[in-house]
Curated annotation (Swiss-Prot):
It is found in: Nucleus. It comes from the Eukaryota. ATP binds at residues 14-22, 37. The active site is at 164 (proton acceptor). This is Serine/threonine-protein kinase PDIK1L. The gene is PDIK1L. It is an enzyme of class 2 (transferase). GO terms for molecular function: ATP binding; protein serine kinase activity; protein serine/threonine kinase activity. Belongs to the protein kinase superfamily. Ser/Thr protein kinase family. Residues 8-333 form the Protein kinase domain. The lineage of its organism: Eukaryota, Metazoa, Chordata, Craniata, Vertebrata. It comes from Pongo abelii. One of its GO terms (biological process) is negative regulation of G2/MI transition of meiotic cell cycle.
Length: 340
């Protein structure tokens, strides 16, 4: 054990999910603000999700301005803490790995185990809240598209498939805004859950994320690609999710989440009085023609074509993250009226 003295002071709770609580905190020595995610390791599924995120975040050797950065991960057992590192031979770390692999608790259940992820603090809420509290703005739309495509290209270059890309998992940082002319910085967060490797186990062995097939059920219905519904997918599923997000952002398409009753940005297909996720509808009818734009009278031809390709039923017909980034840059800077 390293220390029983807290390094961070928790200020307030800023978010709560199915397997963790996020706090705004300050580093005692520097007073710098950070976000701290506290994950209780009381069930094998919690441990597995936490370790996946830790392995993905810690595998990234460089930083990107639009991807959340993991400062450190701290493992707590009762009142004692230690810094956790990938590949550690610490008995506590190995117990968590064993729990994840076996699907059953491999440590004394009477002890309280927690993982604390210390990350960038984002002060502007999430992309969903930010956009829906403001009028549509072409400059903001352009900035957000370019930032998201850059983040996705970076993740895929680092063999990371997000698997749950949606506006709620994209955070807003406004701390560096010097003037009202600057757009906020986006940070892709939660998810980052799968590091692809040729062996499936060695993160140091690179492989194309577009050839790394996954089968674990992941994602949120309205952003899931057809092949995710089937349970056999690659990184092209992230391209589909981003297509849903961009289409919804440009046209301000929203739906009401049936559980939370919250209004969310997201595209869908209408079937009678029902709204159906695009991916689910395409799984049932791969030849279905998507009506784009659905609310506006018109849309720039190149933008419309790109969104349709991102939402292709066949993942092989979608651009990869690197082509997507290039094409969005070309549309943003070469087509002066791209959004109309």
């Amino acid at each position: 054990m390293v220390s029983s003295q807290p390094k961070y002071d928790l200020i307030r709770e800023v978010g709560r999910g199915s397997y963790g609580v996020v706090y705004e905190a300050v580093i005692r020595k520097t007073s710098a603000r950070v976000a701290v995610k506290k994950i209780r390791c009381h069930a094998p599924e919690n441990v597995e999700l936490a370790l996946r995120e830790f392995w993905a975040l810690s595998s990234i050797k460089s930083q990107h301005p639009n991807v959340i950065h993991l400062e450190e991960c701290i493992l707590q057992k009762d009142g004692m803490v230690q810094k956790m590192s990938h590949g550690s031979n610490s008995s506590l770390y190995l117990q968590l790995v064993e729990t994840s692999l076996k699907g059953e608790i491999a440590f004394d259940p009477r002890s309280a185990y927690y993982l604390w992820f210390v990350m960038d603090f984002c002060d502007g809420g999430d992309m969903n809240e930010y956009l829906l509290s403001r009028k549509p703005n072409r400059k903001t739309n352009t900035s957000f598209m370019l930032q998201l495509s850059s983040a996705l290209a970076f993740l895929h270059k680092n063999q990371i498939i997000h698997r749950d890309l949606k506006p709620d998992n994209i955070l807003i940082s406004q701390t560096r805004l010097d003037t009202s002319d600057l757009e906020p910085t986006l940070k892709v967060a939660d998810g980052l859950s799968k590091v692809c490797s040729a062996s499936g186990q060695n993160p140091e062995e690179p492989v194309s994320v577009n050839k790394c097939f996954l089968s674990t059920a992941c994602g949120t219905d309205f952003y899931m690609a057809p092949e995710v519904w089937e349970g056999h997918y690659t990184a092209k599923a992230d391209i589909f999710a981003l297509g849903i997000i961009i289409w919804a952002m440009l046209e301000r398409i929203t739906f009401i989440d049936t559980e939370t009753k919250k209004e969310l940005l997201g595209s869908y297909v209408k079937q009678g009085t029902e709204i159906v996720p695009v991916g689910e509808a395409l799984l049932e009818n791969p030849k279905m023609e998507l009506l784009i734009p659905v609310k506006k009278k018109s849309m720039n031809g190149r933008m419309k074509q790109l969104i349709k390709e991102m939402l292709a039923a066949n993942p092989q017909d979608r651009p990869d993250a690197f082509e997507l980034e290039l094409r969005l840059v070309q549309i943003a800077f070469k087509d002066s009226s791209w959004e109309t």
